[in-house]
Structure formats: structure tokens, C-alpha cells
Amino acid sequence: VIRYLGYGKQFQDFKCNVHISGRQGPAGIKSVLPGLSPESRNCITIENDEMSWGIDASLELWQDCALVLDIHHHWVKTGEYISPADDRLARVKDSWRGVRPVIHYSVSREDYLVEHCATTKPNYDALLEHGYKKGKLRAHSDMYWNSAVNEWAVSFAEDFDIMCESKAKQVASIDFYNQMYQKDISSVLNNIVDSA
């Protein structure tokens, strides 16, 4: 399908994201890459997951395909708010071969962390100690309700495009942008739609 849409002619002119999962992990992905079409190899990205195969496993593939760092998955797997200065991110960036890299961003559901302060980053270990379940912390929120977590996510924007993953999709993405940059981009988006 990607080829028929005209993509895959250049490295990362389109993104087809695959979560690194399954029993074989990086070895399984490495074994199937040679059998993919050139268009598929140009478009595939591999994303760390929150269960079995984290960032370190993803980095085994950094010379084979572009890596997408999902910062929420990393937090759910490790409890760490990874820093944009973390040494591992240099290899994530290098995997993109000069193309601007992408991270994925989401936050735990607002209807699960109901009592949590919206201006303080959730402490993963404290949440687990208080009976919150890892499986429920994985779920994506409707909106980007936590300003402290949002500010952490934006700290990656100098080097990465941020792909928003939320249940409210574009509404949440626009609200996130407006919160972080104190600008209302609705009029810009309306002008783009009107001129199309």
C-alpha cells in the first residue's frame, strides 16, 4: 500500500511504525528485514514497548532502521523520566540518518489518576506503592492534562518531532501545543483547511 501511495522512495518519506514485541524481539526483526521491499525498509520505524522490549533492546536495531522513542512506554517500563541528554538518545537520533527523528508522547489517563496534581509529574514507584496498576498506567489519556509531564515532553522538541498519542487525537494535540507555546494555532489550522 505504501508503494502504491508513492512513498518509500527515500528513507523516512513515510513512517510505518512497528512496536518491538513478540518472543524474538530485536533478533526476530533483524531476521525479517532483508526480506522486506526497499520501500518497506525505507519506511519502517521500530518503537520501544512498555512490557518486554525497552529502549536498550530497540538500540540493537539502530543501524538497521529508524527508532521511535516512546517516552511514556519508557516511563511505564522503568519509572524513569528519561532526559533528552541521555546518551542512548544519540543512537536513536543517529538511526534516522539525518532525517529529523520522532518521539511518541502520551500520559496516563486522567480518569485513572483522578486525585493526582496536574502540575506535578507522577512518581511511578509511589503510584505502584499506593495500589495503582501498571497495566492501567499504560493507557493513553484523552487530553494532555498534566502540565509538568507536558513540559518534560516538550524538552525533547529541540531534537525531535513530537507525535501525540491521545484518545482525543487532534483536539488534544492542539490543546497541548496551545498549553506549551501559549499560542492558539486554531486559526492557522483553519486557514490551512480553508485553502485546501
Task: Tell where the protein language model's regions lie, with residue ranges.
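Active-site-proximal loop/turn and secondary-structure-junction residues that shape catalytic pockets
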Residues: 20-24, 48-52, 71-75, 107-111, ...
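Active-site flanking residues adjacent to catalytic metal/cofactor-binding acidic residues
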Residues: 46, 69, 164
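Active-site acidic/histidine proton-transfer and metal-coordination neighborhood
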Residues: 1-66
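Histidine-acidic metal/acid-base catalytic patches
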Residues: 65, 76-196
